[in-house]
Swiss-Prot record:
It holds the Pfam family Ribosomal_S19. Protein S19 forms a complex with S13 that binds strongly to the 16S ribosomal RNA. GO terms for biological process: ribosomal small subunit assembly; translation. This is Small ribosomal subunit protein uS19. The keyword Transport does not apply. It comes from Lactococcus lactis subsp. cremoris (strain MG1363). Gene3D superfamilies: 30s Ribosomal Protein S19, Chain A. NCBIfam families: rpsS_bact.
Amino acid sequence: MGRSLKKGPFVDEHLMKKVEAQTNAERKSVIKTWSRRSTIFPNFVGLTIAVYDGRKHVPVYVQEDMVGHKLGEFAPTRTYRGHAADDKKTRR
């Protein structure tokens, strides 16, 4: 279920301040954030945001087609290493 249109998209205030400061700065650097719940706005395009996945910060370069999605969608929290090998083959 999506967010109500009358509320509008959500972005953490501290992240928005960092993005605005970064767009005004001449030298761009990586913005670290723990806010996986924030929606990507159009003024985030072209910035690199390091999103925390519970273990480390994953750098996410924001592109045009990411607008409207959440930051957490681009930093997976679980690492899939495949299923365990079938022991039946090795016993024969």
